[in-house]
Amino acid sequence: MKLSIIVPVYNVEKYLAQCLDSLVGQTVEDYEIIVVNDGSPDNSQRIIDDYAARYPGLIVPMIKENGGLSSARNLGMNVAKGEFIGFVDSDDWIDETMYEKMLEAIERENADIAYCDMEDYYDDGTVVYHDVTNFTDPLMVTCSACNKLFRRSLIGDAQFPAGLWYEDLSFVTKLLFKTDRIAVIHEPFYRGHCRAGSIMNSVASKKNLDIITVIDDLEKTAQQFGKEDKIEYLVLSHILLTGINRVAAGEKSTDRTELIKTMREYARKKLPKLTQSESFRSESTKRRVIMFLNYHGLESVSQFILKTKAKMR
């Protein structure tokens, strides 16, 4: 079989049909859609059963006890038959030609991974475009597993880390350490719903500190493949830029203060001389300003700048 698409499902009855419609309508041939119900308490299973009955052999339904996104994806990978593996979140949807175009790009360029652009759709109608061609280093592209297609032989026995946030960063980055054969497609084939109640919007949760666990683990893998220099970028991008900013955007509280302090101390340990870091100096001026402010405990100024820029759009 050419392609396996893995779809973890939990509390998405409102969006699931749109997701599955976009998958069963793919123009690629010889593929399967593995739909893993991760113990969802809503009516998602009824929708899965309906699609499995309408598309026998194409939809592969699975049910498991709730264990989180990583465990659902890992189960899907364990049974996948495809030469290539793709992941789609069950509240998102994709262009009908996405996987056909990705497979063509991989085969044309003899690549192990293909990327495409993404669009995020927010509840207020805002649409944010993510252009993967804006970055020269693959590690700088969005860490989402969902706008990518992976060669199964590259994945090997790699899995998503159970029980942690930033599972995509862990999984994708480890694969990027193993190959530089990447095909890039400048089309927004992947469209995501950004819901107010989604996991990563929990700005005050201590799970934000999972980023430290993930980066420490990635550092071990980086050493195996001679990619130690990439760890600095991960700290810059995922702690000094996005991590601290996400927590700082929440309401003031003791928990928020402690989360930011822990992240900042970790960044300072990894980057004791920030402005001398080649990774830092290679960033754009805008990103360097925000990173510098957050490094020095001035995240309130960062928030003012970011909010002012957002209002001007």
Language-model-derived ranges and their functions:
Residues 224-235, 280-288:
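Structural motif
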Residues 253-313:
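Membrane-interface aromatic/basic loop that binds lipid-linked glycans or pyrophosphate carriers
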Residues 233-246:
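Amphipathic alpha-helical repeat scaffolds of TPR domains
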Residues 1-217:
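Nucleotide-sugar donor-binding/catalytic module of glycosyltransferases
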